[in-house]
């Protein structure tokens, strides 16, 4: 199964999620229906194990949530209510961080009222209030509407801030309502640090053209912080595919745990370690270049990857068949090429966890994704699933 998935990754061309199609006639249907059904049963009887890897805040847990939405009927009202403290904490941490950075960045508040609201927020503990009382809500609303706080937010790449800060603060009036129940979108944007290992099991329908029935998947999520990565090896055994998430938007940010380290550089370094790890050498590797929507917003706001990766300038000078690309397109291609270069470089085995000397024949399958976009993730995962099933049939020499 592992090698079959690997071959299928090499055979299928990488396409952006936005242009994917998933018509059943993409796959051959000339075999006898009963033969297809028997072969599909062989696939169904094997649980496909997928491991999510990547740095912290790259979107791994959001993918787990999407699998639940798409394949396990989403969240009950009780489960939604259980997310309220997490969302409150996201809001509290965001406004607290913004207020705390005003002095550091030398930004003034727009009014004396905002200054008083800032003093109130700074007097509170780091944990969010259990209930959104009127006084707290008034101060948060005042601060988020302050021109100084907005200027601070525009420089949020200079300090740690949740990607979802703007989303939650923009929706604060709705969220602070006493009858609030989190929406699916709220849950997808919520953030809680992953520690340890979590797992989700779900079943996905198999197309009728491939025998019908269902395929079972197990997906594992592990913490992406540096101090959590030593736990990863615990789930390497039996993994048939690795989904490696890398955040395209983090080219101008530094790590929370190491402010001297660029986040994208850290992600590339981690990808190299995963690529060279001998325990994952037979697993298919799929890369989700995630959060490209945030990356595009940053570029429109005047941020440029060349300020953090000087080699980008030479990359853009390379001859291309189509020179009509905008800066966002070039940036996406540049980040992807960084990953491709890693997969093509020869390397020596420096530790027992690395594969042997030589140039690996493995190839990756790349997708640009927005993990909070259910439609995008549905299309991407549908395509990956069909590849797995199609290759299992074709590997038997019948196509």
Curated annotation (Swiss-Prot):
Iron-sulfur listed as a keyword: no
GO BP annotations listed: adenylate cyclase-activating dopamine receptor signaling pathway; mesoderm development; positive regulation of hemocyte proliferation; regulation of filopodium assembly; sensory perception of chemical stimulus
G-alpha domain ranges (all copies): 46-399
Gene Ontology MF annotations: G protein-coupled receptor binding; G-protein beta/gamma-subunit complex binding; GTP binding; GTPase activity; metal ion binding
Segments of this protein annotated with the region G1 motif: 49-62
Chain segments carrying region G5 motif: 369-374
Known role: Guanine nucleotide-binding proteins (G proteins) are involved as modulators or transducers in various transmembrane signaling systems.
Protein name: Guanine nucleotide-binding protein G(f) subunit alpha
